[in-house]
Every structure is written in C-alpha cells, then in structure tokens.
Amino acid sequence: LDMPIEKFDKVMSNNIKSNQILCNLVLPDMVERNDGSIIIISSIGGLKGSNILGAYNISKAADIMMVKNIAAEFGKNNIRANSIAPGLIKTDFAKALWENPDILKAVLGNTPMQRIGEPDEIAGVAVMLASKAGEYINGQTIVIDGGTTIV
C-alpha cells in the first residue's frame, strides 16, 4: 500500500467504480425483466494478501464482495451475480508475467497443473454462469487457476 493516494484511487476506479457504474446501468432492466446474470472478472489476488500488489488485490477482493451484495440484494428479482477469479492466464494483460521466464517458472512451480490458463477456459465458465446451467449459482466466486490457490 506504499503508493501515492492518486495511484490507489486509479486502481479502485478502474477495478471497482467501473463495475459499480456498469452494474447500475444494467440492473434496472434486469429488475424489470425479473431475470439477469452479472459476471465480474476478479482475480485470485482478491483471495489473498500481497506485499507487491496490495491495491490491486484489495480492488479484486472488493469485486468479490460486490458480487455477494448484488446477489443478496437482487436475488429476489431472479438476478444472479457471480465472479470468476482467474490465476495467470495467457492474455495480453498478463503478458509481462508469462513472457518472463523467471516469473513463469515460479508460477508453474506453485501450480499443480504445471501450466498457465487459456482465455477460453475463462470464457467457458462465463458462458456456463450466464446460461440455464448456471441459473442456481448466485453470489459465488469460481476460481480458475490450475490449483494454485490450493497449495
């Protein structure tokens, strides 16, 4: 947390405020339809502390709590809210991590599946949560990390 408050505010704005704004835009229509599914992409960072990514992890923990609160408040309107907490996924966002051999080796050493995730592995869970198969899943965080958080 040793960072200027302006940087902390930017992380919170990018990761929390933006989700709040988007949810407030879609929730009235979902309430009117008495149906809907909100899926927020969080991170395994939201499940643990960090001596490097403190503000990011705090914002991702807030994503997880936002989902729980939306689920509690709007469940009566048949609106579900869930989050997905990915580990290291082969995306442009995380490219600096998976392209760095030392970081990649450290991540793989702590991942039972010995690989990083692929974007379609996140997309598949998002599709399930938004589909009929996910109609009774509400307020949950689904971790997709190859087992990193279990060891």
What are these regions (language model features)?
Residues 43:
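Residue(s) in the substrate-gating loop at a strand-loop-helix junction
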Residues 1, 48-54, 76-77, 114, ...:
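Active-site loop immediately N-terminal to the catalytic Tyr-X3-Lys motif
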Residues 28, 72-76, 135:
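Alpha-helical segment proximal to the catalytic Tyr-Lys
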Residues 23, 59, 67:
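Active-site helix of classical SDR
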